[in-house]
């Protein structure tokens, strides 16, 4: 078994490998790899484990540059899950890839390397040489239960609070549909910026919204679900599809309509649609440990809690003396280390 880099020679074999296991996700895909390169102008260094001429494991990673140095992330951009992709729990494959990842960061003279594990991965017991550790709560709903056979009582699979929210949206005549046109994305962007301003949250860059339409295939790779009250758009939800999993990516809502719960109906209809198309899982993404309200909301959708981790190796101790503002400015979409580890 040897370690290699994913190049054009291996692209089709890599895509075939991802299809072999139901737990590979959107962030592992070739399409997302190319998307990150265009969006962030980063270098891709996807590691693959090859045995007998066949890919048996992978670890997606990209190299990010700032004025003060470089970092290696698996993966960057709002906590995109990377980590080891392997479907049989082969400890040798895992160890080869993880060691290769941290050695790559060292050889590239990075400030640090950060590997974000996938909540779907069943990690064998490994020796991981890291300096800092961060944790998130992954939450995943099994949506296979949402089929036409249960059309009369399918919302009963969810918590009482979620059922009330869905019924409230219906009672208020909220209508939902898929709209992948430019004007729908303009609404998504504007509402996303308003929502983030309200909570002082980090915004997706403007280029992101244009690039999604240009780079991915609508209906196959993504859908933008829209909710209307009469003729007015009041909520939207961007989701991505890959293999057996749907990624809950950008939810937005016009705040004066929050009380009638249009987003809950959007989520429900998008889940049903994905289930009918053969998808198994709805990945809510990571939740910080200090976000109990967000955690409870997802839990009411029958989501299972699966913790996952950020494994960070620091190569240059000067990093600990940098300010949080400097790191955020130079690496806006990368993760170098937990800020509570800084000396400043």
Where do the model's predicted regions map?
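Conserved acyl-donor/pantetheine-binding loop and adjacent beta-alpha core of acyl/acetyltransferases
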Residues: 63-83
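Short catalytic-loop micro-motif centered on adjacent basic/acidic residues
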Residues: 112-114, 177, 281-285
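Active-site/acyl-donor-binding loops of N-acyltransferases
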Residues: 46, 59, 63, 67, ...
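Short loop/turn motifs at secondary-structure junctions
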Residues: 43, 109-111, 278
